[in-house]
Design a protein with these regions (language model features):
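Extracytoplasmic ligand-binding site segments that recognize negatively charged/polar headgroups
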Residues: 62, 105-109, 125-139, 172-194
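Short secondary-structure boundary segments
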Residues: 36, 101-102, 183, 227-231
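Short, solvent-exposed loop/turn elements at domain surfaces
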Residues: 40-45, 60-65, 99, 186-191, ...
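Bacterial N-terminal signal peptides
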Residues: 4-15
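A short, structured surface patch at a secondary-structure boundary
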Residues: 31-92, 96-105, 201-205
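Basic- and aromatic-lined ligand-binding clefts that recognize polyanionic substrates
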Residues: 28-47, 149-206
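Structured C-terminal subdomain patch of bacterial secreted/periplasmic proteins
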Residues: 30-31, 77, 84, 128-142, ...
Length: 279
């Protein structure tokens, strides 16, 4: 496995490079393993469902209502990487593996059977900005040989981002609302805050922190944002409903940094800034 640089030329004229660990494969992959949910959501816009043989979560029927790809992956094997037996994946004859970049240093130890099989691997950093989402779409388009579909997806995503930005600019500064994400992993929420014009009261805190009712009461946000479905080292599960007596309005979103983040942004803006949609 060697390091190469993938160059992505974006439809709006921006050029990026994304360096990933990737073993070159001239054949179009059709037995893909993808662990990050956000990458799964992008891939399902680029390749047929039957080209994916393993995803980074088990099936959860209750999540079909919320996750745009849960129903699509119903018949696909899956588990969180912490609970994955790579010998089971090997039986599916994978020809491309998409992993989160934090596993790159320990990949051989975590997945010894896959490592010995020398299956092409892409280690991808989770996007934190709109531009990084676009870059990730192009990277996945490149490694799956679906560059044209990736270009079309990026162009559509960029148009939706521009529509959101036009709405965000209409929000008077004195009407921007404050918000707290009621979940310990905070790094993805700032992107949504930036795109919707809300003020993230936990922006200056660590990316991982315990969020308690006492902390929320101390910060007194205008709204509390919760996740529809949680996916972490404990598995996949629906979170407990918020405190019914809470004085703060609650909005639930998915918070996956893929093209579907647009849906999260509209969900928030329609509820907290309804005047933007009354024309």
């Amino acid at each position: 496995m060697r390091i190469i640089t993938l160059i992505a030329i974006i439809g709006v004229g921006i050029v990026y490079s994304n360096t990933v660990a990737y073993a070159e494969n001239s054949k179009t992959p059709n037995h893909i393993v993808v662990f990050p949910v956000w990458a799964e959501e992008i891939l399902l816009e680029l390749v047929d469902t039957d080209c994916i043989v393993w995803v980074g979560h088990p099936y959860l029927e209750e999540a079909e209502t919320y996750w745009p790809t849960m129903k699509d992956t119903k018949e696909i094997c899956g588990s969180i990487w912490q609970e994955t037996d790579d010998s089971e994946i090997l039986k599916l004859s994978p020809d491309l593996i998409i992993c989160p970049d934090e596993l790159s240093g320990d990949y051989d130890a975590i997945f010894p059977n896959l490592s010995k099989a020398e299956i092409p691997v892409v280690f991808m950093k989770q996007p934190e900005t709109v531009l990084e989402i676009i870059e990730s779409i192009f990277t996945l388009g490149n490694v799956t040989h679906q560059e044209q579909k990736a270009t079309e997806l990026c162009n559509q995503f960029q148009l939706e981002v521009e529509k959101l930005e036009a709405l965000r600019r209409k929000i008077p500064e004195n009407k921007r609302l404050t918000a707290v994400l009621n979940y310990e992993f905070q790094e993805d929420f700032q992107l949504v805050a930036d795109m919707t014009g809300i003020i993230n009261l936990l922006q200056e805190y660590d990316s991982y922190m315990e969020v308690s009712d006492d902390l929320i009461d101390e910060l007194t946000p205008d709204i509390v944002v919760e996740l529809n479905v949680c996916l972490d080292s404990d598995g996949i599960y629906l979170p407990e409903q918020g405190n019914a007596e809470s004085p703060y309005p609650v909005i639930s979103i998915n918070l996956h940094p893929s093209q579907y983040i647009i849906q999260d942004c509209y969900s928030i803006m329609q509820k907290v800034y309804p005047f933007l949609f009354q024309e």
